[in-house]
């Protein structure tokens, strides 16, 4: 998919989408900070951009209103719901994003019901050579969190970054990033601290690195992370490494995850440039 443009006014965005539908071109709207217009068939990109230029000259032209009447969407196509916060959560997160969030919450509840150690025996990185073929352990450590702040912080970033990746690049891409970063960040962390660790932060740092570099090198991907946030991520790594806050942090997982995300973004953007 290709992002064509963004509109601050959702009604204007809907008018353009409706008009293009009457011309046989299917566009979709994704609501984020603005109304982003996406085109599935990239072979029609030049035609859409030419129509967009004409539309921007006079968006109030009667033919655009007529197109909205024809499609039955003169109300901008938006639904004003009683729970906008929940709607925002749902709109930004795809099935993989939600599945991981639910898994983390369920595991957190289990840890509070039966105790951290009991759950860690089930899900932790292999802590005995006899467990090395229990392959789920190389990934399930990401679901364990040890405080309310720990899980809230990680899930907020996971929803913000993972949801964007899934919505823009697909569930498959998010799965690949998650699996690779969980495996490699876990491997590095167990070298630092042993097998008794947990949390989604290694994957979150991979997503930070991926989204930031992908946005810098491939703006057309539609994902980005403000430079101030990537600087915050780096400062947080430094703070954890120097133990400024007296908190136990998975520093190895953070660094490994960030490197994994940057490397994957570099490879993906390199391949994208070769194709063009």
Curated annotation (Swiss-Prot):
Taxonomic superkingdom: Bacteria
Task: Please list the GO biological process terms of this entry.
Answer: proteolysis
Q: How does this chain sit within the bilayer? A: Multi-pass membrane protein
- TM helices/strands, residue ranges: 94-114, 142-162, 169-189, 192-212, 229-249, 250-270
Protein family per UniProt: Belongs to the peptidase S54 family.
Which Pfam families does this one have? Rhomboid, Rhomboid_N
Enzyme group, top EC level? hydrolase
Organism source for this protein?
Salmonella arizonae (strain ATCC BAA-731 / CDC346-86 / RSK2980)
Q: Does the keyword Protease apply?
A: yes
Question: Any idea what this protein is called?
Answer: Rhomboid protease GlpG
InterPro entries given in the database record: GlpG_N_sf, Peptidase_S54_GlpG_N, Peptidase_S54_rhomboid_dom, Rhomboid-like_sf, Rhomboid_protease_GlpG
Location in the cell reads: Cell inner membrane
Q: Name one GO cellular component term.
A: plasma membrane
Q: Which NCBIfam families match?
A: PRK10907.1, rhombo_GlpG
> Does the keyword Protease belong to this entry?
yes
UniProt function note: Rhomboid-type serine protease that catalyzes intramembrane proteolysis.
Active site as annotated: 201, 254
Entry EC no(s): 3.4.21.105
């Amino acid at each position: 998919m290709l992002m064509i443009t963004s509109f601050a006014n959702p009604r204007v965005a809907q008018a353009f989408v409706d008009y293009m539908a009457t011309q046989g071109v299917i566009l979709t709207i994704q609501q984020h900070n603005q109304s982003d217009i996406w085109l599935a068939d990239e072979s029609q990109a030049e035609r859409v951009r030419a129509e967009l230029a004409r539309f921007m000259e006079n968006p109030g032209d009667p033919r655009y209103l007529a197109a909205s009447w024809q499609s039955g969407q003169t109300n901008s196509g938006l639904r004003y719901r009683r729970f906008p916060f929940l709607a925002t959560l749902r709109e930004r997160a795809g099935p993989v994003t939600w599945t991981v969030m639910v898994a983390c919450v369920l595991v957190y509840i289990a840890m509070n019901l039966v105790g951290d150690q009991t759950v860690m025996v089930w899900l932790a990185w292999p802590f005995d050579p006899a467990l090395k073929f229990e392959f789920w352990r190389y990934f399930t450590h990401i679901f364990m969190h040890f405080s309310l702040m720990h899980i809230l912080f990680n899930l907020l970033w996971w929803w913000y970054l993972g949801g964007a990746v899934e919505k823009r690049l697909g569930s498959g891409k998010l799965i690949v990033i998650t699996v690779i970063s969980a495996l490699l960040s876990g491997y590095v962390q167990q070298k630092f601290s042993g097998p008794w660790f947990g949390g989604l932060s290694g994957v979150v740092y991979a997503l930070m690195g991926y989204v930031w570099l992908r946005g810098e090198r491939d703006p057309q991907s539609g994902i980005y992370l403000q430079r101030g946030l990537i600087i915050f991520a780096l400062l947080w790594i430094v703070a954890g490494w120097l133990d400024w806050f007296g908190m136990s942090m998975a520093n190895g997982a953070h660094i490994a995850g960030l490197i994994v995300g940057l490397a994957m973004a570099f490879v993906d953007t390199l391949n994208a440039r070769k194709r063009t």
